[in-house]
């Protein structure tokens, strides 16, 4: 059992300490793909995108939609509900096929849509509610919209046409299947609160297996393991439970506040000063795992919290709860698809109570594996012994990975890579010594124990990854040289007036303009610089464009606040494009990370 456990920890360390592995798994949970932070001014309002009209003559209700270019309605999202009337099944046109990234081929309507509803038994105060939902090709999905049509009794020759937009009531019902975040957003709009909470709990459970939650595992396990030999299953469960509650409280409050405050709140808690402070905190926590000092509340505090914490050794319920709050706030800052869905709903409807409940359920789902892992500290782990010091040291190394994870958002890439290489090599060296000592203690001849060999393989892989990172630092590839050279092509702009002046200068030279709004705390901004802007096709597509860049790290500075207000910037990264007349092409604005091929195609479609 001990050998198997040691192998699991070694493999866990080998994976979590590999930044490349974490990068590959961001996929749809990445904040950069979130529609929450897209600029609403890029898109038409729902009634402009899908102009609604109807005409009633006797028992026939003719309904039509004038769909704007680059917008579409989902066929399967149409729903009909009658009040004081009956109607036969509505026969909609077939529509055209549309490839949906997450839900396969869907039928959609573009340009114009018309259909007829056959009414029966229309009584007084009769009405029919038509619910529909559509999206913009640029990446925004509207919430389901409903129009309530007041019907007239069958009077030969009498007809009723569409009322003004004020008369048509809009609600938020139906289902969205454009993307995961919008699907989850609109689940909140269903009648069943229980089903909504279950859906978000499952979403959180799936989310718990992504790199976004990675920092929480070493933090919680470090707290549990740090309790020492006196740890029991009950105490481990209690500590884990309150840690998860702290995390859940954070996500619930964070989601509501972010929905109200937008990217300014995000900027504060991703500020370098905050990240440095938290990195120092986790370094101290790691040192405690190595036995440099013991973490314990002052005696006076312990006495005051005696009734609450049952004199828990090495900490308290309050302390663990606060650690969960901190972990949820900063150590796992990814705005994921489930979280984005809840935020999107809150921002659109203002239903904070329902949104907060869903976020809490999402957090509990995220915390379930954490709860199981933490509770295992008193049940599944072997009994006290020398192995405990090894495990504490392992989690000390994992805790040291958290500061690197936080700092790499604003430190130079070469420094981040050096920290990862150093940490992996030091960890591999430690594991090698521990493996040798374990083999000697078990009287296992070198090269002959199965578990010894398997542990050695894991150590070898760690050494390989660490050495590979170190090699890239010492002998950078030509691509890195290209990256550094390409960054110099940006001209820095600091104010709205300077931006307008630079656009005029570019237009006088017959050039268009691309403006990159970035911040040091913005991961997706760094991805743009590393993967997209250096691409040859992207550079060719923008060869006749002046590249401007605005540092939005201090989001609330006077100059940046003016830019934010003028261009209605809700989140980063945002890429603005200006034509030869100096006009911003608002519908072509890019918000969120785009891969090089996609971005190149986007630029080519703009500047043909």
UniProtKB/Swiss-Prot annotation:
Belongs to the thioredoxin family. DsbD subfamily. It comes from the Bacteria. InterPro entries: Cyt_c_assmbl_TM_dom (IPR003834), DsbD_gamma (IPR035671), DsbDN (IPR028250), DsbDN_sf (IPR036929), Thiol_diS_interchange_DbsD (IPR022910), Thioredoxin-like_sf (IPR036249), Thioredoxin_domain (IPR013766). This is Thiol:disulfide interchange protein DsbD. SUPFAM superfamilies: Thiol:disulfide interchange protein DsbD, N-terminal domain (DsbD-alpha), Thioredoxin-like. Residues 161-180 are annotated as: Disordered. GO terms for molecular function: electron transfer activity; protein-disulfide reductase [NAD(P)H] activity. Its EC number is 1.8.1.8. It is found in: Cell inner membrane. It is a multi-pass membrane protein. Required to facilitate the formation of correct disulfide bonds in some periplasmic proteins and for the assembly of the periplasmic c-type cytochromes. Acts by transferring electrons from cytoplasmic thioredoxin to the periplasm. This transfer involves a cascade of disulfide bond formation and reduction steps. Keywords: Cell inner membrane, Cell membrane, Cytochrome c-type biogenesis, Disulfide bond, Electron transport, Membrane, NAD, Oxidoreductase, Redox-active center, Signal, Transmembrane, Transmembrane helix, Transport. The keyword Transmembrane applies. Its main location: membrane. Pfam families: DsbD_N (PF11412), DsbD_TM (PF02683), Thioredoxin_7 (PF13899). Disulfide bonds join 135-141, 212-334, 522-525. GO terms for biological process: cell redox homeostasis; cytochrome complex assembly. Residues 469-608 form the Thioredoxin domain. The chain crosses the membrane at residues 194-214, 241-261, 273-293, 314-334, 352-372, 387-407, 414-434, 456-476.
